Amino acid sequence: MKKKIFYSIIILITGIIVGRNIYLSKTTQTFSNKDIYYFIQEGVYSSKSIMEENVKNMDLKVVDEIDNKYYVYLGITKDENIAKKLKEIYESLGYQIYIKELSLSNEEFNNNVTQFDLLINASTSTKEILTIEKVVLANYEEIIKKNI
């Protein structure tokens, strides 16, 4: 009888330990420290010369080269509603825009974008919004791209 109780306690403790380890490994993978950003994408180009020709008149842009493709971004935000607002602004200017979700993990950039999103929400004019996005893109260049 004592052996059965002893083995039952050992099995119970082993089950708790194994279950806890599995739970922690699953929650760690699910809840990473990366934040979701909405990138306002103008296009993807396979040729640098074609990309340069198409965006030469845009003063407000960031270009990321990934696997010999050139991604042109006109804005970055953490707020989906602001992303939709930016898309509307750029489409009214004649651009074909895509909203692309990307994950980044940089606390400084996260804090900056959060503050800029608050400014955009308080802004009423397109000019103000585009000026704020110019600063966001400069932040991306300075904080994220320099560390890649």
Model-derived segments and their meaning:
Residues 1-148:
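Acidic/polar low-complexity segments and flexible, solvent-exposed patches
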